[in-house]
């Protein structure tokens, strides 16, 4: 994986850094695994705006991803590594020995032609999915379940990974991508390896138009609003807006919003560092 810095022949390309897409092997998705996406423009079923600063963008089709990897013991070969417009990570097309095809989140180092398999008897190799009870300590993992059979919910974005630190009783100690240390049931599954496209953080859009292609609209500064719209709005002339706050009045800098009565607090060994 690599990035390309474009020549500054136009103002929009002067600072632009794009993905090299070296790992991508095809630009044609599997037709049986795509579905249409209806653009809501940030409105709900009543037509009321529920999400600001979203709308427009290029038309996309959803790639149906297998986050559960339930075909235990059936080997699959990697047919292609593809770009997915709906996520930052690349995806891999698998062809199972029984003829079924699925998409999975591609791990860093996954190659076309490589064999992957899921289940308890799988080897701890890149792309294989195993229960946490069968993964060696210290292994870099991604696409982790929080509840058995739920499907991957943790470490799915480009370049993210977690690490299996210890096992005690029926729980595994996981160092999360955020830096948090958390307990997860040993019966939950995870995939070996870090998520692909680790250079995603180096990408620079270069111009406002490319951000619009992604469906993101311009964001209004709170200090430019009126007091009725935001706690930081109003004032005579240009003002600092006072203490930084969200639109709901919650302090924005370092204020902890997690409930002290959250039942899952008992599974957090160490909180992330802010």
From Swiss-Prot:
- What keywords does the record list, in alphabetical order? Ribonucleoprotein, Ribosomal protein, RNA-binding, rRNA-binding
Q: Among the record's GO biological process terms, what is one?
A: cytoplasmic translation
Q: Name one GO molecular function term.
A: transferase activity
Tagged with keyword Ribonucleoprotein: yes
| Assigned GO CC terms | large ribosomal subunit
Coiled-coil stretches noted in the UniProt entry, renumbered to this chain: none
Query: Sorted alphabetically, which InterPro entries does this protein's record hold?
Result: NA-bd_OB-fold, Rib_uL2_dom2, Ribosomal_uL2, Ribosomal_uL2_bac/org-type, Ribosomal_uL2_C, Ribosomal_uL2_dom3, Ribosomal_uL2_RNA-bd_dom, Translation_prot_SH3-like_sf
| Cysteine pairings via disulfide bonds | none
Q: Which domain of life is it from?
A: Bacteria
Annotated region described as Disordered, given as residue ranges: 34-53, 216-274
Q: Which family does it belong to?
A: Belongs to the universal ribosomal protein uL2 family.
| Function, as annotated | One of the primary rRNA binding proteins. Required for association of the 30S and 50S subunits to form the 70S ribosome, for tRNA binding and peptide bond formation. It has been suggested to have peptidyltransferase activity; this is somewhat controversial. Makes several contacts with the 16S rRNA in the 70S ribosome.
What is the protein's quaternary organization?
A: Part of the 50S ribosomal subunit. Forms a bridge to the 30S subunit in the 70S ribosome.
Q: What is this protein called?
A: Large ribosomal subunit protein uL2
Q: What is the lineage of its organism?
A: Bacteria, Pseudomonadati, Bacteroidota, Flavobacteriia, Flavobacteriales
């Amino acid at each position: 994986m690599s990035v390309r810095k474009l020549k500054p022949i136009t103002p929009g390309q002067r600072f632009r850094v794009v993905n090299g897409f070296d790992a991508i092997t095809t630009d044609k998705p599997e037709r049986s695994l795509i579905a249409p996406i209806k653009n809501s423009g940030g409105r709900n079923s009543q037509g009321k705006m529920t999400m600001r600063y979203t709308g427009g963008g290029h038309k996309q089709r959803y790639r149906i991803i297998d986050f559960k990897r339930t075909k235990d013991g059936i080997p699959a070969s990697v047919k292609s590594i593809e770009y997915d417009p709906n996520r930052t990570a690349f995806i891999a097309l698998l062809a199972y020995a029984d003829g079924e095809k699925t998409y999975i989140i591609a791990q860093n180092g996954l190659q076309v032609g490589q064999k992957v398999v899921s289940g308890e008897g799988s080897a701890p190799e890149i792309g294989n999915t195993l229960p946490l009870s069968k993964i060696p300590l210290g292994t870099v993992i991604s696409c982790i379940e929080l509840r058995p059979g739920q499907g991957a919910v943790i470490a799915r974005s480009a370049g993210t990974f977690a690490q299996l630190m210890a096992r005690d009783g029926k729980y595994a100690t996981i160092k999360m991508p955020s830096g948090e240390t958390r307990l997860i049931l040993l019966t939950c599954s995870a995939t070996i390896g870090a998520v692909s496209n680790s250079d995603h953080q180096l990408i620079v859009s270069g111009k406002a138009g490319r951000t619009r292609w992604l469906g993101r609209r311009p964001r209004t500064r709170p200090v430019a609003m009126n007091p009725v719209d935001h706690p930081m709005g109003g004032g005579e002339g240009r003002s600092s807006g006072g203490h930084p706050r969200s639109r709901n009045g919650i302090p924005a800098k370092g204020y902890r919003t997690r409930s002290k009565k959250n039942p899952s607090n008992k599974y957090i060994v160490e909180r992330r560092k802010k």
